[in-house]
């Protein structure tokens, strides 16, 4: 499934130098070229102080945004709200120091995040989940790296103003949603397979004992 997803991502997004993907859903085959837009017109940087009672989330490299309390870190989860930033559902939060490696996630619910994160608020016609997949593409990570500032790789930071200057090619909202739904379905299947495998391994271990 992971190999299938990787292959689809190469087909459903335009290759470098192209304006349409090689594979397109039937209802969008006559929809024309994907338009190139500056990231700053797609997402605005929203800064709002945290609010008491909201869960605190952290950005991870592989799993996007997860509740901080679920991580194996000894961090006080009852932090002062004003010391964090509020993020709204379906926004994107990214770690400035690790965005070039793909350290970002879609906000699953209204929550608080570290003030060190940049919060991207989607504008009209922007489907966050679509861009969640788009920004994970190898060439997108290359753009994010080239726009990050720092003398060495361990000091690279992607500030919002630099992110805003990046050009991203995207289709109309309806096609964004169709592509995002496709990949979300595959991700759900992958998660279900992993959970099933974990259960079977535990069952096997129990039988061996």
Q: Where do the language-model regions lie?
A:
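Short, well-ordered beta-strand elements within core beta-sheets of diverse protein domains
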Residues: 26-30, 78, 118-123, 165-170
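Short, basic/aromatic beta-hairpin or loop at an interaction surface
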Residues: 59-73
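Short coil/turn segments at secondary-structure boundaries
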Residues: 22-23, 52-60, 147-148
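Short, solvent-exposed loop/turn positions at domain surfaces
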Residues: 75-81, 152, 185
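Non-catalytic DNA-recognition/assembly elements of restriction-modification systems
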Residues: 24-51
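Amphipathic alpha-helical coiled-coil/heptad-repeat segments
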Residues: 1-33, 169-209
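A short beta-sheet element
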Residues: 70-71, 81-141, 145-148, 154, ...
């Amino acid at each position: 499934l992971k190999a299938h997803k990787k292959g689809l991502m190469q087909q459903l997004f335009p290759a470098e130098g192209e304006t349409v993907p090689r594979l397109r859903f039937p209802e969008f085959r006559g929809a024309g070229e994907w338009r190139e837009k500056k990231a700053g017109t797609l997402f605005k940087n929203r800064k709002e102080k945290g609010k008491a009672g909201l869960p605190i989330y952290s950005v991870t490299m592989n799993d996007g945004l997860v509740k901080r309390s679920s991580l194996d870190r000894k961090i006080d989860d009852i932090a002062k709200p004003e010391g964090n930033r509020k993020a709204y559902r379906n926004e994107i939060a990214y770690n400035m120091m690790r965005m070039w490696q793909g350290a970002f996630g879609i906000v699953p619910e209204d929550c608080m995040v570290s003030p060190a994160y940049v919060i991207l608020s989607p504008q009209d016609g922007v489907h966050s989940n679509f861009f969640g997949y788009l920004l994970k593409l190898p060439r997108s990570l290359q753009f994010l790296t080239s726009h990050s500032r720092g003398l060495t790789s361990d000091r690279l930071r992607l500030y919002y103003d630099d992110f805003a200057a990046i050009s991203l090619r995207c289709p109309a909202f309806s096609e964004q949603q169709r592509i995002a739904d496709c990949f979300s379905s595959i991700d759900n299947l992958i998660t279900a397979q992993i959970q099933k495998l974990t259960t079977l391994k535990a069952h096997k271990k129990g039988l061996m004992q």
